[in-house]
């Protein structure tokens, strides 16, 4: 086996590992979405919107506590996760992942434009 053959095999092995990692990640994401869908179906959209509001309030409190030094980063991250789970359910209900992503891209681009204008002053 030549050195080039070895490198070619190594590249294929690395590519295969990347594919396996990506497939594993997709499966985990799919299982998470199935769970979120099951929760949404069980409780219904009205109850889950109320739960989203509750989780947002808890996130605000955790954010205040984190900024003030009276609450931990771990608690703040937990509340972020709670809100993200609820937001994922909303996107599932409205079949709106693509639309939400589009709006997010627009808002990030707009804010970057604002930052650029601020820096030019």
Regions found by a protein language model. Give the residues of each.
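Feature marks short, highly hydrophobic, charge-poor N-terminal signal-anchor/signal peptide-like helices
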Residues: 1-12
């Amino acid at each position: 086996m030549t050195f080039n053959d070895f490198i070619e095999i190594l590249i294929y092995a690395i590519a295969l590992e990347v594919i396996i990692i990506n497939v594993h990640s997709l499966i985990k994401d799919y299982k998470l979405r199935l769970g979120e869908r099951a929760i949404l179906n069980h409780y219904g959209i009205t109850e889950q919107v109320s739960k989203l509001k509750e989780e947002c309030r808890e996130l605000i409190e955790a954010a205040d506590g984190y900024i003030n030094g009276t609450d931990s980063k771990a608690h703040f991250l937990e509340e972020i996760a709670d809100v993200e789970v609820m937001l994922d359910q909303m996107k599932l209900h409205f079949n709106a992942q693509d639309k939400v992503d589009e709006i997010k891209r627009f808002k990030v681009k707009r804010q970057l434009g604002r930052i650029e204008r601020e820096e030019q002053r």
